[in-house]
């Protein structure tokens, strides 16, 4: 059996992904990175609706038979973002064990307490993440760009205490997350999207706002100041974090001394507004932006 130092996590006690029996459902990039990360830390089993297509022998030997899943008692189930709990082969099993479902973001948070900027929203996530990453890199931060942008968060290597993360998070990832926290959270905008997955607009909005729900006092959330769906949700709930409303239409106040043409294009003005507000909170060197 595995033996690791017990690690306490503020708010949730001991690390819940050490020395456990874990099922990873979905063998795309996210699922495979979770397997590689956890395989020497816990007893990990794999399943995918299309597992018969898997050729890698190291992966195949960890795949559990469909029938054996129902005979097993798992401590945690890590669900890949692409798995729709209502349409997959293990739908009934997952609904019965909903309290055991976690995301790769949760696994990351259990092992690392690094500062993160986590960006979500209906539009502009990738552009804003890339821009934030470039700015931090230019200012000599040890920074990783991960998440829905294409690099699974658990595939990050050479992580130090000072490593800073820029994370693109989709509603699918956040929907399954339970314990993940980010010191800096960003909701760029919200409009009806992925309703075929979330079933209702309200559930889609709630998934996005999980990012703020788990934040603590001393954390910061940046949101579009005139977004109707965002403001409605803010009125309905109280959050421990400090809410910073970003005026995306008054970009001129940020650009007085900026010559970078990227910031001046209309398409990037809204994204740039968020980046400037976050940079201000991080006390970044304005000359280098």
Question: Where do the model's predicted regions map?
Answer:
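N-terminal leader/targeting and accessory segments in enzymes
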Residues: 1-103, 107, 284
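Adenine nucleotide phosphate-binding catalytic loops in nucleotide-utilizing enzymes
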Residues: 16-20, 25-27, 80-81, 198-205, ...
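Phosphate-binding loop of NTP-binding sites
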Residues: 20-21, 36-39, 69-74, 81-221, ...
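Residue-level detector of alpha-helix initiation sites
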Residues: 29, 123-127, 269
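Short beta-strand "acidic-cap" motif of Rossmann-like dinucleotide-binding folds
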Residues: 44-49, 144-145, 166, 245
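Short alpha-helical "patches" and their helix-cap loops
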Residues: 51, 167, 285-289
């Amino acid at each position: 059996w595995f033996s690791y130092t017990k690690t306490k996590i503020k708010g949730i006690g001991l690390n819940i992904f050490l020395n456990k029996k874990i099922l990873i459902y979905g063998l795309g990039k996210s699922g495979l990175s979770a397997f590689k990360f956890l395989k020497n830390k816990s007893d990990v089993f794999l399943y995918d609706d299309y597992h018969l297509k898997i050729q890698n022998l190291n992966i195949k030997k960890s795949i559990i038979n469909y029938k054996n899943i129902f005979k097993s008692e798992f401590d945690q189930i890590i669900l890949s973002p692409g798995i729709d709990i209502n349409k997959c082969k293990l739908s009934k099993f997952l609904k019965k064990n909903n309290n055991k479902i976690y995301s790769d973001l949760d696994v990351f948070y259990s092992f690392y307490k690094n500062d993160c900027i986590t960006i979500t929203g209906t539009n502009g996530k990738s552009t804003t993440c890339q821009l934030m990453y470039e700015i931090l890199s230019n200012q000599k931060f040890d920074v990783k760009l991960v998440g829905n942008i294409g690099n699974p968060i658990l595939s990050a290597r050479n992580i130090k205490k000072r490593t800073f993360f820029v994370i693109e998070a989709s509603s699918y990832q956040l929907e399954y997350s339970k314990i993940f926290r980010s010191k800096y959270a960003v909701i760029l905008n919200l409009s009806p999207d992925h309703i075929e997955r979330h079933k209702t607009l309200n559930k889609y909005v709630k998934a996005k706002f999980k990012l703020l729900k788990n934040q603590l006092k001393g954390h910061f959330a940046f949101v579009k100041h005139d977004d109707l769906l965002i403001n409605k949700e803010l009125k309905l709930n109280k959050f421990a974090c400090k809410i910073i409303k970003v005026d995306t239409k008054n970009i001129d106040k940020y650009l007085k001394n900026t010559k970078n043409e990227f910031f001046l294009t209309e398409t990037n003005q809204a994204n740039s507004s968020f980046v400037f507000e976050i940079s201000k909170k991080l006390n970044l060197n304005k000359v280098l932006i």
